[in-house]
């Protein structure tokens, strides 16, 4: 068979076409890898909390002051309540008794004092201390007369004032010192001043002729010269020294007295070798020291009495002299023991202002 070139080309083209067929399948692309697991973002650190403010440190002095003010307010309230009750006690019958006590005639100051000791005008409870305080013996030793002009330095709660007032009302004169009742509200001295004021006001019949001289504790001035026959300071001297005013008070007493006048001191007696700066904090002073100080102001020692001595007083208590009766500062702790000791051992000194 004759194969032409055209035929050959045709055959070759068919063969090529058959060989080509359908194109080979295209391999599918591998699936994409799974996404990487999402990591949770790290937890944010908690916001810093502001530091709590540190409370200010307690100021011991401020706390002490607050406690003192609270106690002062409590004591002021108690004082006013007691004064109200005492004023109410002075009814018409008691006022009449006071007038009769003052009007009566007595042969001596001692007799007048003994009559006053029995009076119902005395603050309830005060008579309980007569045996320990010896008021008649003290005042007779100091030379009290019914005609005397007497200055009482520091009336306190009026223990001596209510005895002296009726004795001197008719022929003599009683002058007492007190702190300002209108002083600063945060001062305990103001309480003391108010207490004296309330005492004087409760009975014009008893205290109407008593003069009150208001003094400044830090600068005591009586404003009296050469008029007094007797100046007394009963259980006051330790406080004078503790406040650095011992010399000032003694100088005022000297100035106020007539020549020949008497300065009478009753004070808690320390051990002979005691340091007065330290013993005064406990309420006591050495007797020799007191004598030396008073004589250095111009006085002469006119006599000593042991009427107020108490050998049971050991003078070494936790709360000083205030551990003993009548204060009993420890309350019920060892109360029977301190009651058995009794009131303090006291010096009783009579000084005389020399005549010109």
Regions found by a protein language model. Give the residues of each.
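C-terminal motif of bacterial Sec signal peptides marking the signal peptidase cleavage site
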Residues: 15-18
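Conserved beta-strand signature within the Rossmann-like core of class I S-adenosyl-L-methionine
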Residues: 174-178, 260-269
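Class I SAM-dependent methyltransferase Rossmann-like catalytic core
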Residues: 108-141, 145
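A short glycine-rich, Lys/Arg-flanked "PGG" loop and its adjoining helix->strand segment in the class I
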Residues: 165-166, 246-259
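A short acidic, Gly/Pro-enriched loop at the edge of an enzyme's catalytic core
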Residues: 210, 221-231
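Bacterial signal peptide processing site
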Residues: 20-23
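A short, conserved alpha-helix within the catalytic core of class I
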Residues: 217, 239-252
């Amino acid at each position: 068979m004759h194969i032409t070139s055209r035929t050959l080309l045709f055959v070759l083209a068919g063969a090529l076409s058959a060989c080509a067929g359908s194109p080979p399948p295209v391999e599918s692309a591998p699936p994409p890898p799974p996404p990487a697991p999402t990591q949770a973002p790290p937890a944010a650190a908690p916001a810093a909390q502001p530091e709590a403010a540190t409370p200010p440190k307690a100021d011991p002095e401020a706390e002490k002051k607050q406690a003192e003010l609270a106690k002062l307010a409590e004591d002021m309230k108690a004082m006013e309540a007691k004064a109200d009750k005492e004023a109410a006690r002075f009814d018409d019958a008691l006022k009449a008794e006071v007038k009769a006590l003052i009007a009566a005639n007595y042969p001596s100051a001692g007799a007048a004092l003994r009559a006053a000791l029995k009076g119902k005008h005395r603050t309830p409870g005060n008579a309980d201390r007569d045996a320990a305080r010896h008021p008649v013996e003290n005042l007779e030793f100091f030379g009290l007369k019914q005609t005397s002009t007497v200055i009482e330095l520091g009336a306190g709660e009026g223990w001596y004032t209510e005895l002296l007032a009726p004795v001197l009302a008719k022929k003599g004169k009683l002058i007492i010192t007190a702190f300002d009742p209108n002083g600063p509200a945060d001062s305990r001295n103001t309480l003391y001043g108010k207490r004296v004021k309330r005492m004087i006001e409760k009975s014009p019949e008893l205290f109407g002729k008593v003069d009150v001289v208001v003094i400044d504790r830090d600068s005591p001035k009586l404003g009296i010269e050469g008029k007094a026959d007797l100046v007394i300071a009963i259980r006051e001297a330790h406080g004078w020294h503790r406040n650095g005013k011992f010399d000032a008070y003694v100088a005022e007493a000297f100035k106020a007295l007539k020549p020949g006048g008497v300065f009478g001191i009753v004070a808690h007696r320390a051990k002979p070798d005691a340091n007065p700066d330290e013993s005064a904090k406990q309420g006591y002073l050495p007797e020799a020291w007191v004598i030396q100080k008073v004589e250095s102001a111009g006085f002469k020692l006119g006599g000593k009495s042991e009427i107020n001595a108490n050998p049971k007083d050991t003078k070494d208590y936790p709360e000083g002299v205030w551990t003993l009766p009548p204060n009993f500062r420890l309350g019920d702790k060892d109360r029977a023991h301190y009651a058995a000791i009794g009131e303090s051992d006291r010096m009783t000194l009579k000084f005389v202002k020399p005549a010109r």
